[in-house]
């Protein structure tokens, strides 16, 4: 097995490391932690501009198809910077689920909005006290206008 990074993978790592070094200092992170949202919407938009939110998504959805190695490289740099944005939960977990839906209409619009940095996604897969039993969900989704209310 060859564990050396390709030139493209090295460029991805170097670019992410440089971005976080220049735009994600310790004091900025501290201020974000104290803010109402707890993360930077500006950084989320920059991640979209850099193509990071499309990383690993199907090309037919407008994504950047690649192996999980590239995603792991980026996740390592998010960890190194102690980045607060929901990259793993939104872009990786939810993005990969929506990108692989057999019915593109089911998640295509949400995936597009996430890859453009206009929204963040959340995976509701556990509930307090459910003991990992998916047969009895307590969460109920009710249509409200253009969206849904989760209760």
Where are these regions (language model features)?
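Intrinsic disorder at enzyme termini
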Residues: 1-8
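Residue-level signal for inorganic ion chemistry
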Residues: 9, 20, 74
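An alpha-helix initiation/capping motif
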Residues: 10, 37-41, 88-95
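Short alpha-helical functional segments enriched in proximate histidine and acidic residues
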Residues: 19-23, 121
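Short secondary-structure junction/hinge motifs that connect adjacent elements
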Residues: 27-50
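Internal helix-loop-helix
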Residues: 49-108, 112, 116-117
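Glycine-rich, Trp-frequent "lid" loop and neighboring beta-strands that shape
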Residues: 63-64, 104-151
């Amino acid at each position: 097995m060859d564990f050396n990074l390709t030139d493209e993978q090295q460029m991805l790592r170097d670019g992410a490391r440089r971005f976080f070094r220049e735009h994600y200092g310790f004091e900025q992170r501290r201020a974000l932690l104290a803010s109402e949202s707890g993360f930077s919407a500006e950084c989320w938009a920059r991640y979209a501009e850099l193509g990071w939110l499309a990383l690993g998504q199907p090309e037919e959805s407008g994504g950047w198809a690649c192996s999980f190695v590239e995603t792991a490289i980026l996740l390592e740099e998010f960890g190194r910077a102690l980045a607060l944005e929901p990259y793993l939960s939104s872009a990786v977990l939810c993005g990969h689920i929506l990108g692989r839906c057999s019915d593109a209409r089911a998640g295509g619009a949400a995936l597009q909005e996430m890859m453009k940095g206009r929204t963040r996604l959340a995976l509701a897969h556990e509930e307090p006290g459910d003991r990992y039993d998916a047969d009895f969900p307590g969460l109920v989704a009710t249509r409200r206008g253009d969206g849904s209310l989760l209760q």
